[in-house]
Every structure is written in C-alpha cells, then in structure tokens.
Regions:
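Bacterial N-terminal signal peptides that target proteins for export
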Residues: 1-9
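Bacterial N-terminal signal peptides
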Residues: 8-16
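Boundary at the C-terminal end of the N-terminal hydrophobic targeting segment
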Residues: 19-20, 24
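Histidine-rich, glycine-flanked metal-binding segment
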Residues: 25-28, 33-39, 48, 52-103
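Divalent-metal coordination cores built from histidine and acidic residues
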Residues: 37, 97, 101-102, 106-109, ...
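Short active-site segment of divalent metal-dependent hydrolases/proteases
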Residues: 113-114
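Short coil/turn segments
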Residues: 118
C-alpha cells in the first residue's frame, strides 16, 4: 500500500471517529402532550391485577393523590351493579376503566437512554418505555452523570414525557469530578457529596 492510500485511509478513519464523538444524546423535549399531574385522580371500575400472583379483583376504584396511589377500593363484584355508596369521592380527573384491566406500572431495573450513535433521541426511548407499561426506570448509566441527573429532575417535575427515573451512576463519573478513581470509602464519600 503506498503512502497516499494509507494516509487517506487513516484520515477517513480519523474523520469518522471525530464525527461520532461530536454527536450528543438529545435530552427529552418539553412536554407538549398528555394530561396531569392531578392533585386527585380516580380510575373507576376496572379489574385489578396487582402482580402478586393472586386472582384479579374488581371492579375497583383507584385513588391517586399527588402522584401516589392512596387507596384501592373494591366497589362491587363482577356481573353485579356497582354500589355507588362504596365509591370514593370525585377526583379532579377521572378515567372510566369499566371492562378494562389495570396493572401496576412496570419497573425496568437496567435502563440506558440510548446513545448518540444508535438512539440519539431520548423522546423515542421514553415513549417506547411508557407505551410498554414501564413507568419507572433505574438508569444504570442512563447516560453521563449530568445528563442523567438533569433528566431525572425534569421527569420528577413532569416537564418531559418520561417514566420516573432513578439515576444510578458508576462512582467517579462527572465532568467536573477531579478525585480520580473511587477505590476506598473516603473517596466514595467525597464522590457521593460531589454527585
């Protein structure tokens, strides 16, 4: 191989590597769809499969207050008219789940938000999770530290359409971290305070 051909190959490889490095993971877009959060939401008349292996129960009314399930109230029996006296009071927002099954949100314990090369648009990843019933993710390296903490906070504030995010990072990550590798308890404490 002559010098010019070899130089062109090396230059092209260098350009490809630099182009890949310059891409960045795109944070979630500001929320433009969906409803909520609500101070008090009630899901009415559904059949609950609670995930513990017991048979489905229902119809039930589920009361969600301040983004937490507050109460699951049995309001009758299948095939029998619902006893209106057993129903919880009205919510700010209500969903009629009659004839539908209600499942708890799934939790993905090992999640990544994508990568600039494969899935640079986190909106796609977040909506894919939500569409499959995943309402909480444990990001084990969701992305870099700063990105992960920012997305976690934005999800908590409900400014993006995304599941709840729990950011679990590898000790020693962070663009401003100057403590080197975390290899002992003192360095671990220092990094936790940093993060």
């Amino acid at each position: 191989m002559n010098k010019i051909t070899r130089s062109l190959i090396i230059f092209n490889i260098f350009c490809v590597v630099c182009a890949q490095q310059s891409k960045a993971l795109k944070p979630g877009s500001e929320r433009s769809e969906g409803k909520g959060p609500f101070k008090r939401m009630v899901i009415r008349g559904g059949t609950l499969i609670n995930g513990d292996g017991s048979p489905p129960i229902g119809p039930v009314d589920i009361v969600i207050e301040n983004n937490r399930i507050n109460r699951v109230q049995s309001v009758g029996y299948p095939g029998v008219p619902i006893n209106e006296n057993r129903r919880p009071k009205k919510g700010d927002f209500e969903i009629d789940a009659s004839g539908h099954y209600i499942l708890p949100g799934f939790v993905d314990l090992h999640a990544h938000a994508g990568s600039p090369q494969k899935a640079p648009d986190t909106d796609y990843v977040y909506k894919l999770w939500l569409a499959h019933g995943v309402t909480t993710v444990r990001g084990v390296g969701l992305a870099n530290l700063e990105f992960s903490l920012s997305e976690k906070n934005r999800s908590k504030l409900n400014t993006i359409t995304a599941p709840r995010i729990w950011a679990y990072q590898r000790p020693g990550q962070g663009k401003d971290w100057r403590g080197g590798r975390v290899q002992d308890p003192q360095a671990a404490r220092k990094w936790v305070r940093y993060a």
